[in-house]
A protein has these predicted regions:
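Beta-strand-rich extracellular modules
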Residues: 151-159
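Conserved aromatic beta-strand anchor motif in extracellular beta-sandwich/beta-rich domains
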Residues: 109-113
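Generic structural detector for well-ordered beta-strands
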Residues: 123, 134, 174-176
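Short glycine/proline/serine/threonine-rich loop/turn segments at secondary-structure transition edges
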Residues: 139-149
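Solvent-exposed serine/threonine-rich low-complexity stretches and specific carbohydrate-binding patches
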Residues: 117-126
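Primarily secretory-pathway and cell-envelope proteins
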Residues: 17-108, 160-180
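Exposed aromatic-hydrophobic patches
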Residues: 129-139
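N-terminal Lys/Arg-rich, disordered targeting/topogenic segments
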Residues: 1-13
Length: 180
């Protein structure tokens, strides 16, 4: 009788170990997929300038003259802060980014965290700035409270034709995300 009980216990132990190993392998496969094969969906930069940013405000007393630009080229000047705050409950992004009046191009600002575009502004005309933008719907589910290394990606557009320039600028920023 004792031998049968021991065989039954051995069989149960082997079954449990087999199930645990199977669960471990499944967990490893899911982790590898999540880390290496899942792709984030990037926001494409428009080829032609989008609508003018509705939350942009005029810069205070920017009386500088336009920068000189070669024919067919452009010249830009940037004013920005490297600190960005995201409030998940208000769905607001607080930042400081300006396209000074001396620039010769319109700009579109993107905030990127871990290769995911978190926000894209409308077109910023020379002489305008933004200090607060709305967080797009659904982005609050992708972020958790804490600090992130991010970047501003600045896209340039010709003022006359609205065509996107072949160059862009990437600026490292520190993003602080809060719940309230």
């Amino acid at each position: 009788m004792d031998i049968q009980k021991e065989k039954k216990k051995d069989k149960q132990h082997k079954t449990i170990i087999l199930l645990l190993l199977l669960l471990l392998i499944l967990s490893l496969c899911m982790t590898i997929w999540a880390l290496f094969f899942r792709e984030s969906v990037p926001v494409l930069a428009p080829d032609y300038a989008p609508e003018i940013e509705s939350r942009a405000t005029q810069l205070d007393s920017d009386s500088s003259t336009k920068l000189e630009a070669p024919p067919g080229g452009g010249a830009v000047s940037l004013t920005y802060s490297k600190d960005v705050s995201v409030n998940l409950s208000d769905k607001k992004i607080d930042l400081m980014f300006a396209n000074p009046a001396k620039s010769t191009a319109d700009m579109v600002l993107q905030l990127v965290i871990k290769d995911t575009v978190i926000m894209q502004s409308g077109r910023l005309l020379p002489g305008n700035k933004v200090t607060s933008l709305d967080l797009p719907d659904g982005v609050e589910n992708q972020l958790a409270a804490g600090g992130y290394d991010g970047k501003f990606v600045v896209l340039y557009y010709d003022q006359q034709s609205g065509e996107k320039a072949m160059i862009h600028t990437e600026i490292p920023v520190t993003v602080t995300v809060t719940e309230s």
